[in-house]
Curated annotation (Swiss-Prot):
Protein name: Glutamyl-tRNA(Gln) amidotransferase subunit A
Known partners and oligomeric status: Heterotrimer of A, B and C subunits.
Pfam families cross-referenced by the UniProt entry: Amidase
Keywords: ATP-binding, Ligase, Nucleotide-binding, Protein biosynthesis
The keyword ATP-binding appears for this protein: yes
Catalytically driven reaction(s): L-glutamyl-tRNA(Gln) + L-glutamine + ATP + H2O = L-glutaminyl-tRNA(Gln) + L-glutamate + ADP + phosphate + H(+)
Source organism of the structure: Paraburkholderia xenovorans (strain LB400)
Record SUPFAM superfamilies: Amidase signature (AS) enzymes
Xref: Gene3D superfamilies: Amidase signature (AS) domain (3.90.1300.10)
InterPro entries: Amidase, Amidase_CS, Amidase_dom, AS_sf, GatA
Length: 495
């Protein structure tokens, strides 16, 4: 049963092959058995089974929606009533929210059953899920490897079949990169598509929630429930509701002569295929592109000339916003408070020094510096100007193509601990995802192969980038690939 997709699980529930309670119990047992992966921060069988019983009651009416009774894991950056919501940090290790994040509420209202809160890099700052106060997450494909970050717990949970789907967030690649490293499908929607209300903030102009699952079809079904305007989020977009599944299985053009993607133009940025791309990743991406050509698509070279500037731009803007957002965690209203202190100022200092981990402190310091008097114009304002140019470069490219494709990361997953002492090397791993986030565009990762040699068990993801509000078409393109290949069906050994 754990090998079934969301659609297949829903069919099993409808046919009474199993109940929502039995399904929840199955995944709870799997989570317990795979505890060594450290994919979950919190599991509460009582809360999970109570939701499952309510879902069964709804299923018995015969009028349940497509997600009723299906299990989901939530990244622990979404506040969830009744559960601890930690953001992977000591600062919030005992925090319980009095309300649900909009994403959590919408999926719960759709009837989904929460099986637990997944591990993550502290406050979503990281590319390896090694920055969590609750310990690193292991990659189910190779337990010596990182699962990617910051949504590494969600990616590992879906890859190891501990949940059929999970929520994630993407600030600079935190859905796409762990999806690539863990061999699953994940999509970052257009900025503003999914409400940030109740999502513990890292960088407010970049943060975006999205689904992580086995397939593009499952992600489309989840996005139907997650997306939509929310008046409680000032950055939420006012758009007509969409059915993100509407193009699945449909040809790109009606007169495609039997080829499902005839007429599709795929842009290949020359900057994504330079010397820094590992040979085994390049081989998998090239094979995927050949498959797209077989499906009828045409490959077009495009240019994104400011790609290399996305790293310095991101690591000015994101830390600046983080230093502001995280200033609220002072040990007064909520969060960790130092046990001993001399006065109020000493309490602030000690509480924040004890509550935040090294990477979070590093980014707060960088952010405070670039926002300080005398440096704001030289760093923050300049970065915002280049950000606008990066977005314009994408629009120029989209005049020549319908979607853009390339690698998600320059390499497959690296070994746990391999880059912990060199944060710059960790930052460079986001070279292909940061510009998409800076532009606010939708992007996704689709499994397309594996590494070579010692990395032969480590997955490779193909990145698909669409223009604003083009998620339904992106999902169509990804789904066509998955109908023709079986990379997304492969599972780690022993799963």
């Amino acid at each position: 049963m754990h090998e079934k997709s969301l659609t297949e699980l829903r069919a099993a529930l409808t046919a009474r092959e199993c109940s929502a309670v039995e399904l929840a119990q199955l995944y709870l047992k799997r989570i317990e058995a795979a505890n060594s992966l450290n994919a979950f921060i919190q599991v509460d069988p009582d809360l999970t089974l109570a939701q499952a019983k309510a879902a069964d009651a709804l299923l018995h009416t015969g009028h349940a929606g497509p997600l009723v009774g299906l299990p989901i894991a939530h990244k622990d950056v979404f506040v969830t009533k009744g559960w601890r919501s930690t953001a992977g940090s000591k600062m919030l290790s005992n925090y319980e929210s009095p309300f649900d994040a909009t994403v959590v509420a919408r999926l719960q209202n759709a009837g989904m059953v929460c099986v637990g809160k997944t591990n993550m890099d502290e406050f979503a700052m990281g590319s390896s899920n090694e920055n969590s106060y609750f310990g690193p997450v292991q990659n189910p494909w190779d337990v010596k490897a990182v699962p990617g970050g910051s949504s590494g717990g969600s990616a590992a949970a879906v890859a190891a079949r501990l949940a059929p789907a999970a929520t994630g967030t993407d600030t600079g690649g935190s859905i796409r990169q762990p999806a690539s490293f863990s061999g699953i499908t994940g999509i970052k929607p257009t900025y503003g598509r999914v409400s940030r209300y109740g999502m513990i903030a890292f960088a407010s102009s970049l943060d975006q929630g999205g689904p992580m699952a086995r397939s593009a079809a499952d992600c489309a079904t989840l996005l139907n429930a997650m997306a939509g305007f929310d008046g409680r989020d000032s950055t939420s977009l006012v758009r007509d509701d969409e059915d993100y599944t509407r193009y699945l299985g449909q040809p790109w053009k009606e007169d495609g002569a039997g080829k499902p993607l005839a007429g599709l133009r795929i842009g290949l940025p020359k900057e994504y295929f330079g010397a820094g791309l590992a040979d085994d990743v390049r081989a998998s991406i090239d094979a995927a592109l050949k498959q797209y050509e077989a499906l009828g698509a045409t490959l077009v070279e495009v240019s994104l000339p400011k790609t290399e500037l996305s790293i310095p731009v991101y690591y000015v803007i994101a830390p600046a916003e983080a230093s502001s957002n995280l200033s609220r965690f002072d040990g007064v209203r909520f969060g960790h408070r130092a046990a001993e202190y001399r006065d109020l100022l000493d309490m602030y200092k000690k509480s924040r020094a004890e509550g935040f981990g090294p990477e979070v402190k590093r980014r707060i310091l960088v952010g405070a510096y670039v926002l300080s008097h005398g440096y704001y114009d030289a760093y923050y304002l300049q970065a915002q100007k280049i950000r606008r140019i990066i977005a314009q470069d994408f629009q120029e490219a989209f005049r020549q193509c319908d979607v853009i494709m390339g690698p998600v990361a320059p390499t497959v997953a690296w070994d746990l601990g391999a880059k912990g002492d060199d944060p710059v090397q960790m930052y460079l791993a986001d070279i292909y995802t940061l510009s998409v986030s800076l532009a606010g565009l939708p992007g996704m990762s689709v499994p397309c192969g594996f590494g070579a040699g010692a990395n032969a068990q480590r997955p490779v993801g193909l990145q698909i980038i669409g223009n604003y509000f083009n998620e339904a078409r992106m999902l169509q393109v990804a789904d066509a690939f998955q109908r023709a290949t079986d990379w997304h069906r492969k599972a780690p050994a022993g799963v």
